[in-house]
Amino acid sequence: ANAKKYIDFAAANHIEAVLFEGWNEGWESWGGMQSFDFTKPYADFDIDEIVRYAKEKGVEIMGHHETGGNIPNYERQMDHAMQWYTDHGIHLLKTGYAGAFPDGYLHHSQYGVNHYQRVVETAARHQMTLDAHEPIKDTGIRRTWPNMMTREGARGMEWNAWSEGNPPSHHVMLPFTRLLSGPMDYTPGTFDILFLK
């Protein structure tokens, strides 16, 4: 029901796509060896009905692959999961890497760089557009792989939900700092996180 409300809002406000996070099984075991299943929705998320409804309203769905930093688990499923999205008519994908990589590797390590390259190439084979969160720095890869639409790589306003937030100067500096390296996905606001309604 909530998914359809967001699709209706997007259609009414000329928003081209809606991102749904947390629809796939595995969130309750974050960080576990087999935590996320990238093709198995929770029982209350009917992916076929949601895609059908979105298409009827002229809105695209952006899929979400949060890895929690568990790269081996994601790479085992990546090709099949992207094909699964393609089969469902989903061609936009946000990847996420909130969490430590295995064996102490850092996001910007050679291990991380190689992984991101595999993701971009696999997505291209499946004609998927990518938005990477917790990415490596922009390297110009989108010149070779234009399906690499954007990456986060900045402290967005979601930080206002659990911390003192960002000062106003942070937001106005980003166009002159972070954006010099390429397109940026930025979280511009936070919904009511207290759930008072």
Where are the regions that the model predicts?
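Aromatic- and carboxylate-enriched substrate-binding clefts and catalytic-loop regions
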Residues: 21-196
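An acidic-aromatic substrate-binding cleft motif
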Residues: 1-8, 13, 17
